[in-house]
A protein has these predicted regions:
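Conserved hydrolase catalytic core segment
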Residues: 139-177
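Flexible "cap/lid" loop of the alpha/beta hydrolase fold
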Residues: 167-196
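N-terminal cap/lid subdomain of alpha/beta-hydrolase-fold enzymes
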Residues: 56-110
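Conserved acidic catalytic loop of the alpha/beta-hydrolase fold
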Residues: 121-140
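Catalytic active-site module of serine/aspartate enzymes centered on a nucleophile-bearing elbow/loop
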Residues: 298, 305-337
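Conserved strand-to-loop "acid loop" that flanks and positions the catalytic carboxylate
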Residues: 282-287
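Conserved alpha/beta-hydrolase "acid-adjacent" motif
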Residues: 289-295
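Alpha/beta-hydrolase
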Residues: 187-278
Length: 337
């Protein structure tokens, strides 16, 4: 199916208007498309900029449309599909997401040559620009996790007329001061690596430090039970090989500038919950160190029309990737409400 035909069909769903009455799709053969939208965007902290926004659209063509966004490591490839059969970053939620047509983008600043401060609202405006290019007037919901939840909140505030609801998983109206402090150290590690002509080493170490905040002491205590051991004349802790593998994956995924700018973008994020004028479902994790459930409770209290669901997990911030059943059930509740 051509881009125009697919876009017109999705747009026709949005003609239902503010009531947002969508019917479940019964198409068994999903279609997928990828593209790049070139346009000029006014960036919050950097002014007018020519951008190339990489997008992917997949799922049954007559299904309600979701915008889906994850953490800074997430890409436009959410699920394996006809364009790319490899597993997407949220393949674990395939059972839930297959009911919908899914639109996602690669973040501004992710390997596209933009080396300037990027705000979460810039990402929201980039998604709106893609919707314009595809001829899509309105979507069923914006489902965001981690950084993607922050972008979803910005989208809801700036483009409320374009969606019926927003689901924010482990992403609040601001960054917690403890989390911002931790990320500032990570960025300094990356910068130090670059100064020492060891960019990859600095990036890998920064990611290893980040992993400690994504997970929890409880998970580590149950997962890494061996004692610290001497290898030659060096003490090695049982989690080191796991953390080193995480660091190497980050090196394969990011360049230093992209990692630094997207990390900054998390900390630059700020929005008044009162400005979110669409129904908001907030999903918190009780063990999340990066985005404490107290912050998400505040978001839900201050937003005009919000619902809060707290999931118990020992995975911390990464629960949105690991707690498949609990997250899927919460998503069902949010979008069926």
């Amino acid at each position: 199916m051509s881009l125009v035909a697919a876009s017109l069909h999705v747009a026709s769903e949005s003609a239902l208007g503010p009531a947002c009455r969508f019917t479940e799709a019964h198409v068994t053969e999903p279609l997928a498309e990828r593209g790049v939208h070139h346009c000029s965007l006014s960036l919050t902290h950097a002014g007018q900029c020519q951008v190339a926004i990489r997008w992917e659209l997949c799922g049954p063509v007559n299904a309600p449309l979701l915008i889906v966004a994850g953490g800074i490591s997430a890409t436009r490839h959410v699920l394996g599909n006809d364009v790319d059969s490899s597993e997407g970053w949220w393949q674990a939620q395939a059972h839930f997401l297959r009911r919908y047509r899914v639109l996602a983008i690669d973040w501004l600043g992710d390997g596209d040559g933009i080396d300037a401060p990027i705000d979460s609202r810039d990402q929201a405006n980039a998604i709106a620009a893609v919707l314009d290019a595809l001829g899509i007037a309105k979507v069923r919901a914006f489902v965001g996790a981690s950084y993607g939840a922050m972008v979803g909140l910005q989208f809801a505030a700036a483009h409320a007329h374009r969606l019926c609801a927003v689901v924010a998983i482990s992403g609040a109206h601001r960054s917690h001061p403890w989390s911002s402090a931790l990320r500032s150290i990570q960025r300094k590690i990356v910068e130090l690596g670059s100064l020492q002509c060891a960019e990859g080493h600095g990036l890998a170490l920064a990611r290893q430090l980040a992993m400690l905040s994504y997970r929890t002491p409880k998970e580590f205590s149950s997962r890494f039970t061996d004692p610290v051991a001497l290898e030659g004349n060096r003490a090695v802790c049982p989690a080191e090989s796991y953390l080193e593998a995480c660091g190497q994956r980050a090196c394969a995924r990011f360049d230093a500038a992209s990692y630094r700018r997207l990390s900054e973008s998390i900390d630059l994020h700020s929005i008044e919950p009162e400005s979110i004028r669409v129904p908001l479902s907030v999903i918190a994790i009780d063990s999340d160190q990066l985005v404490p459930s107290e912050d998400l409770a505040e978001l839900a209290v201050r937003a005009p029309d919000a619902w809060l669901h707290v999931i118990s997990s020992h995975y911390g911030h990464d629960a949105f990737l690991k707690e498949t059943s609990a997250i899927g059930a919460a998503l069902n509740d949010a979008l069926d409400a």
